[in-house]
């Protein structure tokens, strides 16, 4: 188990929100952050603090992306025509690990990253082991035949915690998914409020 995987609930506690909507999140039991000082009363956040929190929450949701990774994606969103915040969400949802998670092939986004890294996923019939690989409209993502009896996969397919969004068409009997289109913010089934507009404000000022 990687440090990032073992720390997934610390992200919830740091944000003070159950950002993946999981029943076992410690936030369901307590509302303070991690560490010995977590129970201290939090003061009112400044505009900077609110914007930073929005960025950290979005980074955390997609597997605790590094600042370098997230900043690179944001830079691409900024260069593409249209609303930068909406573009950012679309690019994040195009990540292969995000699609594997959305398709409910695995239970968590951290498991999705590991699953892709270990070569369990095919894109258009070819093995792809890069979690950040950008999926295109019409791409078919599937679990390799040898990996279809993976316990994590079997458990995830049975989960009722997450609905598959309509921008991905999934056949769980075959463990295949087709990426239909890049979504906007309103299309993505986040369990908590995500505010990419605040991320745009953060980078505009910093």
Curated annotation (Swiss-Prot):
Domain of life per record: Bacteria
Keywords: Ribonucleoprotein, Ribosomal protein, RNA-binding, rRNA-binding
Region annotated Disordered, chain positions: 18-46
InterPro entries (UniProt xref): Ribosomal_uS4 (IPR022801), Ribosomal_uS4_bac-type (IPR005709), Ribosomal_uS4_CS (IPR018079), Ribosomal_uS4_N (IPR001912), S4_RNA-bd (IPR002942), S4_RNA-bd_sf (IPR036986)
UniProt keyword annotation of Phosphoprotein present: no
Tagged with keyword Nucleotide-binding: no
GO molecular function: rRNA binding; structural constituent of ribosome
SUPFAM superfamilies, per database record: Alpha-L RNA-binding motif (SSF55174)
Entries under SMART domains matching the protein: Ribosomal_S4, S4
One Gene Ontology cellular component: small ribosomal subunit
Biological process, per Gene Ontology: ribosomal small subunit biogenesis; translation
Start and end residues of each S4 RNA-binding domain: 94-156
Alphabetized Pfam families for the sequence: Ribosomal_S4, S4
Family: Belongs to the universal ribosomal protein uS4 family.
Subunit structure of this chain's protein: Part of the 30S ribosomal subunit. Contacts protein S5. The interaction surface between S4 and S5 is involved in control of translational fidelity.
Alphabetized NCBIfam families for the sequence: PRK05327.1, rpsD_bact
Function: One of the primary rRNA binding proteins, it binds directly to 16S rRNA where it nucleates assembly of the body of the 30S subunit. With S5 and S12 plays an important role in translational accuracy.
Protein name: Small ribosomal subunit protein uS4
